[in-house]
Amino acid sequence: LDLARDVQIAYADLVFARAQKQIAAENARLRQEVAAIAAARLRSGDISELEESASRLEALRAQEAAVGFVQGAEISRARFNTLLGIDVQDTSFALTPASEMELPQRTLPELFNAAFASRPDLRAAELAIEAAGKRIGWERAKILAFNGVLDVNGAGKEGFEIGPGAQIEIPLFNWNNGKVARAQAQMEQAARQYLVVKHRLALEVQETYTDYFAAQQALTLCRSEWVPTATTAASQAQKAYAAGDVSYLFVLEINRQLLDARVREAEATANLRRATARLQHSIGFYQAEREN
């Protein structure tokens, strides 16, 4: 379960790193054009040396960032390969970015139930209760009944309390006091651990559920508002330049803003992929449930 989540997150990181590398290269090219225009304007006396130096430094920073993103993409590929169990330098297979997966619409209580039914760590806690029940001589029906009513009420007068179901007494028979105390302690420990795991799973589902919908909304906003607006502005700037209404420098600046929008979209996409992987992990199922 953890490996499936980690592979999906590594895939999201790799796709994002590649997008960053491509966009950074385009940004470096734009900055170089701006620097070249600034140098020409300096020669014609339109700007000062300080302004030209600022443009040149921006171009150098963009080139440095592009190199860094190339290295980052290589590291992301190595991490992804490692999780798949193949050589870190193996690039013989190509990755085609898939569209973002939309999970079935489920309410939070439904996700809680899915997690409680599927998570192996909660099942392990249930098995610990079964083992403790067998040690004190309970039949399976009584163990299942105990699991059914087990709940947390906080600290009561008697310390640990089971939930608001029927009282279940531990049959002690002719055991001595030492065995009685040990059986009581083992059952209480197993029950407490079960509740701890169940509460932790509920919190994990709640957090990942919230993160998933926040990431989904952020990507929707980016694709419906940010990128279309920047794309339209770039197209209008190009037409205005062709008509002689604006300078080429203005067109380059608008195109740089479009690159910023594309970075935001790539980041939002990666965040949604990561959030999806974590939500799937929290509820304990993957492809089989989606196909159903």
Residue ranges and their predicted role:
Residues 69, 120-121, 268:
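Metallo-beta-lactamase
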Residues 2-114, 208-211, 215, 219, ...:
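Periplasmic alpha-helical coiled-coil/stalk elements that build and connect Gram-negative outer-membrane
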Residues 5, 77-86, 109-193, 203, ...:
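A small-residue-enriched
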Residues 213-242:
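C-terminal hydrophobic structural anchor segments
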Residues 264-292:
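Acidic, low-complexity, intrinsically disordered peripheral segments
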Residues 48, 201, 208, 244-248:
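Alpha-helical heptad-repeat coiled-coil segments that mediate oligomerization/polymerization in large
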Residues 46, 91-130, 170, 184, ...:
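Bacterial Sec-pathway N-terminal export signals of envelope proteins
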Residues 42-46, 241-245, 282:
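A short glycine-centered flexible hinge/capping loop motif at secondary-structure junctions
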